[in-house]
Amino acid sequence: MVQRGSKVRILRPESYWFQDVGTVASVDQSGIKYPVIVRFDKVNYSGINTNNFAVDELIEVEAPKAKPAKK
């Protein structure tokens, strides 16, 4: 399940970041076509480092880190 903080690999062939790994910044639950915002370390030709993707265009590589328990 893709969720905030997950490391994901991009499967959209026309994307600048195709086969690259990025971090999920947020997942929108409203039903839009591209609900997952992914942030990358490198920028594209326009200087942008985020993009929206559909859930089926992503493969989760690493689950998000668990938050430490509060005392």
Curated annotation (Swiss-Prot):
Protein name per Swiss-Prot or TrEMBL: Photosystem I reaction center subunit IV
Major subcellular location class: membrane
NCBIfam families: PRK02749.1 (NF002745)
Any one GO CC term of the record: photosystem I reaction center
Topological category with respect to the lipid bilayer: Peripheral membrane protein
Keyword field contains Disulfide bond: no
Compartment(s) where it occurs, according to its Swiss-Prot or TrEMBL record: Cellular thylakoid membrane
Recorded family membership: Belongs to the PsaE family.
